[in-house]
Amino acid sequence: MARVAGIDLPKNKRIDVALEYIYGIGKKNAKDVLAKVAGQIDPATRVKDLTEQQAGLLNTILQKEYKVEGELRREVAQNIHRYIEIGSYRGQRHRRNLPVRGQRTKTNRRTRRGRRKTLRGSA
């Protein structure tokens, strides 16, 4: 199993699909990364067939040019915290654990709010 960006990639998947298992890398970014190493790594290569050198090459590209995993998660959390600190509308919605992007809340808000909390004495 190849370890890229601190993640164990599934060994039987093609490398272009396996890169999507890294937080922050989707289809487009995976395709772009493989385009940068087009001479060395074929997108149809399975992860189990990668050499250590090829895995190292992927690691260096991901570290230099992309924010992935912990670094990206930390940035997103800091952005949310910043919204809360400045008291913006988005920050207020985050603080109250309500939908942030304009969805209705009269009925369909259960996903964001979580399970119902029943009060004692009410049926």
Predicted regions and their residues:
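Surface-exposed, charge/polar-rich loops and edge strands
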Residues: 4-11, 17, 41-45
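Electropositive
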Residues: 34-72
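Mid-chain, well-packed structural core segment of small domains
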Residues: 58-93
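Arg/Lys-rich, often Gly-containing low-complexity segments of ribosomal proteins
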Residues: 88-123
